[in-house]
Amino acid sequence: MGNVISKVKSLLGFEDYEEYDEYEEEQYEEQVKDEDEIEPVITNKKNSKVVNIHTSSTTKVTITKPIDYEEATEICEALKNRRIVLVNTTVLELKIAQRLLDFISGSCYALGGELQQIEKGVYILSPSNVEVTNELKNELSSKALFNWSK
């Protein structure tokens, strides 16, 4: 009876077969280059001329007195072109001036620059290659070189 059941299982495809996969181990050989084949790279440091692209002989200063918020992009473009920008916001409404300062301070931060207040409503934006010291800031505010209230 066991014979009949095994024949039926084999016809239906249910017969258990133990299959063994035979694997052949392949051997890999690493190709090693001789040290004689490697050529050293020789650089001539005397002929290489590296120039900083951000070096400029003259620094330009842009002085703006915006009358609306739309001028914020022009201020940021000047800062992006590595110019020092003086911004006078005394003629703007308080809310518009705050929005303008938020926008240009974010751009200044993204470009690696610095925003400092000189006087009430007057700000200086300096690019990353320019440093404004506190002595200069104190001197500008004490001498009132930029008297915008006239």
UniProtKB/Swiss-Prot annotation:
Its main location: cytoplasm. The keyword Glycoprotein does not apply. It is found in: Cytoplasm. Keywords: Cell cycle, Cell division, Cytoplasm, Septation. One of its GO terms (biological process) is FtsZ-dependent cytokinesis. It holds the Pfam family SepF. InterPro entries: Cell_div_SepF, Cell_div_SepF/SepF-rel, SepF-like_sf. Coiled coil: none annotated. GO terms for cellular component: cytoplasm. Belongs to the SepF family. Homodimer. Interacts with FtsZ. Cell division protein that is part of the divisome complex and is recruited early to the Z-ring. Probably stimulates Z-ring formation, perhaps through the cross-linking of FtsZ protofilaments. Its function overlaps with FtsA. This is Cell division protein SepF. It comes from Clostridium beijerinckii (strain ATCC 51743 / NCIMB 8052). The gene is sepF.
